[in-house]
C-alpha cells in the first residue's frame, strides 16, 4: 500500500459513483486493473472456493496472505473483505485489523453476522464496539485505511430495513467511513439507505441484474461492488465446459481469450 493508494481510495468515495469489482486471485486482479477499474475489492467467497472450501470457512492467516498477494500485485486501491474480523471480541478484531492494514490494503470492511442460526446478527452494542475497535486500530496505525461497516440482516434472513438503517447509522457514528448492507435489491431500500447514512457513502452490492451503474448513481450510491459474482461466473463457465468435455464435446475450445496478452510478461 502507498499513501497515494489510500488517498485515491478516499477521493473515489467523495463524489460520483465508481465500480469496484472483486477479483479472487492475483491473475483476475491484474486483469481487472488492466481493464481500467480504479479500485478492487477482495471476496472471501471467491478466495474460499479457490482453496476448495465453502464460503465462511477461511482462516485469518489465509485471508491475510491473500490480501498481501492482491495488494502487491496491483497499483490501484484494494479493499479487503475481512468478514467479521475473524473474531467476536472487539479487542481481537482490533488486533486483526492491525495485521490487515499491514498487508498493503487501502480499505477494509467488518460485518455483523454471528454465524449462529438462532441469533444470526451480533447484538447491536457489540457490533458497534467492534466497529469502534476497528476504527481505533486504523487510527493508531496511521495508515488512513478506509473503514466500511456492514449490516448483514438481508444476508442472514433478517430483511428488516428499519433495523438495517439503525445499524448502519450506529456504525457511521462509531467511525465507519462507508456503509454497506449486502443483498439489498429494492431501489426504494437503496434510496432509504443512501439518505440514512448521508453524507457518508453507501456501497451497493450488485449480484443480480436489478439496476445499472447509471441508475444507482442517480440514487446517490457512491460505490458498487459485485461480491463473489465474478468468481461465480468463472465457475459457471468452468463447470459447463468441463461437462462438455465429459460428454466428448470440445467445441467450447474455440475463440479462447489471449490471457498471456492481457496479463503481459511479469518479468518485463
Identify the role of each PLM range.
Residues 2-80, 84-226, 233-239:
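Alpha/beta enzyme core
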Residues 9, 228-268:
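Extended, intrinsically disordered, low-complexity segments
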Amino acid at each position: 500500500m502507498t499513501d497515494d493508494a489510500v488517498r485515491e481510495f478516499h477521493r473515489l468515495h467523495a463524489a460520483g459513483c465508481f465500480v469496484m469489482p472483486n477479483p479472487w486471485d492475483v491473475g483476475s486482479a491484474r486483469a481487472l486493473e488492466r481493464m481500467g477499474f480504479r479500485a478492487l475489492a477482495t471476496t472471501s467467497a471467491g478466495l474460499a472456493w479457490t482453496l476448495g472450501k465453502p464460503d465462511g470457512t477461511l482462516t485469518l492467516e489465509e485471508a491475510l496472505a491473500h490480501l498481501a498477494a492482491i495488494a502487491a500485485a496491483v497499483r490501484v486501491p484494494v479493499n479487503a473483505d475481512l468478514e467479521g474480523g475473524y473474531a467476536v471480541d472487539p479487542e481481537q478484531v482490533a488486533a486483526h485489523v492491525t495485521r490487515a492494514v499491514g498487508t498493503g490494503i487501502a480499505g477494509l470492511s467488518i460485518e455483523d453476522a454471528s454465524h449462529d442460526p438462532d441469533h444470526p446478527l451480533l447484538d447491536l452494542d457489540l457490533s458497534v464496539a467492534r466497529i469502534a475497535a476497528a476504527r481505533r486500530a486504523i487510527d493508531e496505525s496511521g495508515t488512513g485505511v478506509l473503514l466500511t461497516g456492514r449490516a448483514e440482516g438481508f444476508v442472514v434472513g433478517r430483511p428488516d430495513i428499519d433495523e438495517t438503517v439503525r445499524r448502519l447509522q450506529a456504525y457511521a457514528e462509531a467511525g465507519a467511513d462507508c456503509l454497506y448492507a449486502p443483498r439489498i435489491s429494492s431501489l426504494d431500500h437503496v434510496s432509504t439507505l443512501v439518505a440514512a447514512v448521508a453524507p457518508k457513502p453507501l456501497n451497493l452490492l450488485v449480484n443480480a441484474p436489478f439496476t445499472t451503474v447509471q441508475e444507482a448513481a442517480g440514487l446517490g450510491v457512491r460505490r458498487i461492488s459485485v461480491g463473489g459474482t465474478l468468481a461465480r461466473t468463472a465457475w459457471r463457465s468452468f463447470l459447463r465446459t468441463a461437462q462438455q468435455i465429459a460428454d466428448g464435446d470440445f467445441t467450447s475450445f474455440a475463440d479462447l481469450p489471449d490471457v498471456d496478452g492481457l496479463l503481459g510478461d511479469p518479468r518485463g
